[in-house]
Amino acid sequence: MYLIADWRRTHYSEEVIPEMDGQEVILMGWVHSIRALGKLAFVILRDREGTIQAVVPKQKVDEETFEIAKKLGKEDIIAIRGKVVANEKAPKGFEVIPIEIRVLNKADAPLPLDPSEKVPAEIDTRLDKRFLDIRRPKIQAIFKIRSEMLRSIRKTFADEGFVEVNTPKLVASATEGGTELFPISYFEKEAFLGQSPQLYKQMMMAGGFDKVFEIAQIFRAEEHNTRRHLNEAVSIDTEMSFVNEKDAMAMLEKVVYNCYADIEYNRPQEIELLELNWEIPEKTFDKLTYTEAIDIAISKGVEIEWGEDLSRAAERAVGDEMGGLYFITEWPTQTRPFYTLPHENDNKVCKAFDLMYKELEISSGAQRVHKYDLLVENISNMGMNPDSFETYLEAFKFGMPPHAGWGLGADRFAMVLTAQDNIRECVLFPRDRQRLTP
């Protein structure tokens, strides 16, 4: 068994092409499969980018190399130094003939999970053995697309002049006055894991940053057990000064559109591997009001009254009607947090919006209240004590500009982009009501 020593990978599997005939390469990865047929062995090496075939003919390699090849096991870690040989009959038009094989580490057998995807496994088993599960090419494809999604979003924000910020995740009280918080011991006090950076984003508007964003974890102690909820999630949050809710929606459209375009350009292999029906959306999305959404739901037999939040049945009804990406706007004020700005002509309706994909909510936002007196009134009307929000409210006394923003669920958006029906597929180590390990 060898150390890497002076060897360094020269190529990933997908970088080797037939035109490199005669060139020496060093490959490193896992043994995806091994077939020993008398005086010939076939080793499929798998790395981050794909698989590559090494052919080990006894008459063309030294005895030690051939014996090492024959004794390889699935998922052993190996390094191969060899020559590329063009061969039209080979799977990719070439094969690699090893000069030397180094076994860097052995894998125990039997494997608790088959990374080759030949043996199916339930999602709980896969999540228990996630380190093996993410070796599967299709699982890696999900996370490569997710990575490109986040890279694209950061680039769009940078191009638009946003400042990236990091807000506290240990907080003294609830952001929105709810009780769905995880309490923790904080020295002699009680604290909570943050459920949203909302109040801090708004305070940054008072600080004069104009446009900020954050990509970070949020925590919600909701006792859901569904395919679309987690208790720890990644949220993409933004806030902008001197804008209204329509400007915030336009920015969200730009972020989402750019994600689709960047993924199509930079991750075509992953799109193909996942067999995605990929289509870049229009630059502006369809929009309907909450009232119109309620009318659609009622017309499809859903029992719901104006002023209620949309039930799952209502979301399904509207999603079936709309399809794709669309906004629901002009929500009842009573369904939204205290910092949401009511319409000036009808305070029963507020300047809030949700971005939906079919029946799935992926983003929520609004124009915010920027007047101190109205904010205090809203907090009181919702049965909360303004004194509990003293440090937040202070930012509104000394020059708070009009502002708007939104939060986009990274995990849910990744679900949409990769066409997964369970949010856990898009999170490396998900945290839900039952799962706290690995």
Swiss-Prot record:
Its main location: cytoplasm. Aspartyl-tRNA synthetase with relaxed tRNA specificity since it is able to aspartylate not only its cognate tRNA(Asp) but also tRNA(Asn). Reaction proceeds in two steps: L-aspartate is first activated by ATP to form Asp-AMP and then transferred to the acceptor end of tRNA(Asp/Asn). The record marks P91 as: Important for tRNA non-discrimination. It comes from the Archaea. It comes from Methanococcus maripaludis (strain C7 / ATCC BAA-1331). Residues 198-201 are annotated as: Aspartate. It catalyses: tRNA(Asx) + L-aspartate + ATP = L-aspartyl-tRNA(Asx) + AMP + diphosphate. L-aspartate binds at E176, R220, S364, R368. This is Aspartate--tRNA(Asp/Asn) ligase. Mg(2+) 3 binds at E361. It is an enzyme of class 6 (ligase). Homodimer.
